[in-house]
Amino acid sequence: RGDEWFSYFETTDGFRVIKDEAGNYVYALWGADGKSALPTRIIAHDPLSREVEEREFLKNYPKDEQEKIHTRAFEIQNQSNAQQRIGEMTTHTGAPSIPVILVQFADTKLTETDPKTGYEERLCRPATQEEVEVGKGSAYQYFVDQSLGKFTPNFVVIGPVTLESGYAVYGTDVNGQDANVGQMIVEAIQKAVATEEISDWSVFDNDKDGLVDAVYVIYAGEGQHALPMQTDLIWPHTFQIENRGLELPEADGVKFNQYSCSSEMMRGKVEGFGTFCHEFSHCLGLPDFYRTDGLSSSVFTMESWSLMDYGSYTDDSFRPIGYRALEKAYMGWITPIELTEATTIKDWKSTDRGGTGLKIVNNVESSEYYIVETIDESGWNKGAFGHGLLISYVFLRSMEPWYNNTVNNTNPPRVSIVGADNDLTTLITGVNEDKYYSSLAGDTYPSPNGNDEFTDSSTPAATIQVGFLGLQKPLTHISYDRAKGTVSFDFMGGSEDNILTGVVAAKNTATVSEGYYRLDGVWLGTEKPEIPGIYLQRDVHGEMRKIIVER
């Protein structure tokens, strides 16, 4: 259990275990320093497999041991919060250049014959909508589409470079944390600079503050997020070098600090770019939407509906779920519309196709609201398990939990999905995958069980935490037009005199989301090229197609 900051292992009924010198998982007790775990001699089993000695041991197991684990997780989280505020990179528009360093270890090499070409294919190139929908998109296209062309990052792949030591030197856990991962990042940067592939590293300082905006490291082999029992692997994460207590590397007058990293492999296969998009989104300012405090939780948050939860893994990470309206609004890519009076909404598009989110705000507490959006069956939504109207709940009185990456370390959570069928099954890997993914199909409105309304008295209901009179802003007659990929509904009873339909989010004039590209991704402008050849054309709806200009 855990994340990049603190991880530990426990039995299915919550007893902490640790690996002893013989390689057995035994019950653990905290040391006197309150920071390190000590092994007992009792080998751990799940409840149905325990013998008498083990059961007797657990009868006397100190009741405060689990609380100590949670306290330690909280201490580490607070320490990381004090050091790291999500969102070092403030550039959310334009075409910033971001270095991506491919890293091999002395004992583990990247598996592809030509890894640089492979990562340029997965990260850097423009992709058509058709390619996106069959899992052949790219990280570049992901951010272009989420931003409606406002943000077109230029990922520059460097390497591979080979580090001096094996992966375990950098990844072995000490008291639940990767001990030397910072050294991996510094060494990777130093070796990348030494290759002289980049003639001027200052091009990566897009805001001219003397720091490379962000550097991304992709390391060979598996990550501990996929194989948590293998404690010598590295967790994908985003952090700062200075907060690892290391001197900042420097090249061409700029220093390196903010970084992200993730693994090449995911359970035996080359991973797509979902985790890459997740970690890079941390650099841009998005938090995790799962619990980050080490506590067990059966509370449904954003789950597979958000890139910042399980949604990064859709289609083996080759078709990560698109940004939710809340996430796009934070980036400044869309501006949600608040519904305040009786309105009929017709043919509402997804935010990927130019629509926007609709906010329904608690009149008593403006920081508590619902945000609704359309999930269609195209582009990055193609892999979604449900389609129709998706409703998210938000209650953020302060942005501190967002910046400190503790958004959903509360019960109830601050940001979560409303399941239309009222089935909020949480994922337990290896136990209930089929039930979990089946339940996601019922999260959107109208649900498979026929629920087409969201009111103070519906199931689920439009509940609020602040106020006694309820939300009093019902959504009724919710429908989804599969052919159009749009949603319609009545707000507060609807109104023939107040109809909202097909609103398109504001876009930059003549951005790279519209117009013509060369096949290598260079934007040529909005006028059709005159030189014969094959080009990519993106229309005002963000859809791309190949064209041929003949002599």
Regions of interest found by a model, annotated:
Residues 214-384, 395-397:
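Extracellular hydrolytic enzyme modules, especially secreted metalloproteases
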